[in-house]
Amino acid sequence: MYKNIKKFKLESFIAQEIGNLIVSRGIKDPRIHSFLTVVKVEFSKDLINAKVFMGSIKEGASLDNAVKALNNAKGFIQSQIIKRIKVRSTPKLLFVKDDSLSKSFYVNKIIEGLNTTREN
C-alpha cells in the first residue's frame, strides 16, 4: 500500500512540475506552447520509467511537434525535476500524445449542435 501512495504522489508531482515548466516557458522551444497540458503520468512498477501523456486544450494545435520537442528536452526536464524532488533517481520520461482532450471537445461540439437543433 505504501508503494501505491508513493507512486500516486510521485505521478502527481511530476505532472505538476512538467505543467509548471510549460506554463512558465522554462523550456525554450517554440514548438512547446502554453496550451499543452499533462493528461496523466504513469510509472512502471519499479518507478524507473514514466510515461507522460500530453494533450492540448487548443483545437488544431500541433500536438505531434510538441511531443517531439518534449522528448528532445526530456534531459533538461528531468534535471529540473530532480532539483525540486528528493528521490534517489529521477524516472526516465517518455512523452506520449493523448487525443482524449480533442475527442472530448469534438463530442461536446456534437452535443451542442444537437441542443441547438432541438431548441429550433
Swiss-Prot record:
One GO cellular component term: cytosol
GO molecular function: ribosomal small subunit binding
Subcellular location: Cytoplasm
Xref: InterPro entries: KH_dom-like_a/b, RbfA, RbfA_dom_sf, Ribosome-bd_factorA_CS
Record keywords: Cytoplasm, Ribosome biogenesis
GO biological process: maturation of SSU-rRNA
One protein family per Pfam: RBFA
Annotated family: Belongs to the RbfA family.
Its job: One of several proteins that assist in the late maturation steps of the functional core of the 30S ribosomal subunit. Associates with free 30S ribosomal subunits (but not with 30S subunits that are part of 70S ribosomes or polysomes). Required for efficient processing of 16S rRNA. May interact with the 5'-terminal helix region of 16S rRNA.
NCBIfam families reported for this sequence: rbfA
Matches recorded under HAMAP family: RbfA (MF_00003)
UniProt subunit comment: Monomer. Binds 30S ribosomal subunits, but not 50S ribosomal subunits or 70S ribosomes.
Name of the protein this chain belongs to: Ribosome-binding factor A
Organism: Borrelia garinii subsp. bavariensis (strain ATCC BAA-2496 / DSM 23469 / PBi)
